[in-house]
Amino acid sequence: MARRPGAPAAYGEDFSFVSPLVKYLLFFFNMLFWVISMVMVAVGVYARLMKHEEAALACLAVDPAILLIVVGILMFLLTFCGCIGSLRENICLLQTFSLCLTVVFLLQLAAGVLGFVFSDKVRGKVSEIINNAIVHYRDDLDLQNLIDFGQKEFSCCGGISYKDWSLNMYFNCSEDNPSRERCSVPYSCCLPTPNQAVINTMCGQGMQALDYLEASKVIYTNGCIDRLVNWIHSNLFVLGGVALGLAIPQLVGIMLSMILVSQIKDQIKLQLYNQQHRADPWY
């Protein structure tokens, strides 16, 4: 039977341009992160439900649980498009997945570049976030544990200095403050005591009333912002490796989805050609 010049070569009925390897690799790739996203949302929702209503509303902007829920929901929606799109060979869902993942990757890249170029503004924003967290230190147990962990890990106290704790109503040094913690700092600011079996939670009592030299004998007096900046400078290669580790899965997801979309389009063209070929033997 003659074939019209320029028409595609004939393929068997069982032939498919869509590679099962690419299809199911993309599916299981998204399934893994889909499960992770559901766990993140579940943990975030559980953490929110365990808090008192007043505390939950007071520190909404600096609540780690909210961040966990938001990131989890966005990841869930994104990986849903990837999972269903690859399994059902749906071009629309796959292109949505690829586009969103590309936007996320570019936003991360832009944030890194802008953070490096406008480091002073980033420093000011970080200081604002830390001060806001200090204000709500006693309002949220998760936030309190996060701050305590950060101060102990980086051997620091407050944002700029230990006196930043006056921003908190319980640690404020004003004369009319009835709190027993007036002019104090949290125990996580205290220097570690060797062979101490029980943590002295009152070790920071009255530390804000002391000058820098006197306070430095008992607590960390350096602010956490400077410590954080120094830590970043000392661990640039490690942070670069982490950034690369985050970028590679995103680039792999973008690449696999684009390859699969191209294969699906070729398969659609083949099906259309076969239909026309059966309808017109001279095609």
Curated annotation (Swiss-Prot):
InterPro entries: Tetraspanin/Peripherin, Tetraspanin_animals, Tetraspanin_EC2_sf
Assigned GO CC terms: adherens junction; cytoplasm; plasma membrane
Superkingdom: Eukaryota
Membrane-topology annotation of the record: Multi-pass membrane protein
Localization: Cell membrane; Cell junction, Adherens junction; Cytoplasm
Record bears the keyword Cytoplasm: yes
Gene Ontology biological process: protein localization to plasma membrane; protein maturation
This protein's UniProt keywords: Cell junction, Cell membrane, Cytoplasm, Disulfide bond, Glycoprotein, Membrane, Transmembrane, Transmembrane helix
Coiled coil: none
Membrane-spanning intervals of the chain: 25-45, 65-85, 97-117, 236-256
Glycan attachment sites: N172
Main location: membrane
Disulfide-bond pairs as recorded: C156-C224, C157-C189, C173-C183, C190-C203
Cytoplasmic side of membrane: 1-24, 86-96, 257-283
UniProt-listed Pfam families: Tetraspanin (PF00335)
Family recorded in the similarity comment: Belongs to the tetraspanin (TM4SF) family.
Role description: Part of TspanC8 subgroup, composed of 6 members that interact with the transmembrane metalloprotease ADAM10. This interaction is required for ADAM10 exit from the endoplasmic reticulum and for enzymatic maturation and trafficking to the cell surface as well as substrate specificity. Different TspanC8/ADAM10 complexes have distinct substrates. Plays an important role in normal erythropoiesis. It has a role in the differentiation of erythroid progenitors. Negatively regulates ligand-induced Notch activity probably by regulating ADAM10 activity.
UniProt subunit comment: Homodimer; disulfide-linked. Interacts (via extracellular domain) with ADAM10 (via extracellular domain). Interacts (via cytoplasmic domain) with PLEKHA7 (via WW domains); the interaction is dependent on PDZD11 being bound to PLEKHA7 and facilitates the docking of ADAM10 to zonula adherens.
Protein name in UniProt: Tetraspanin-33
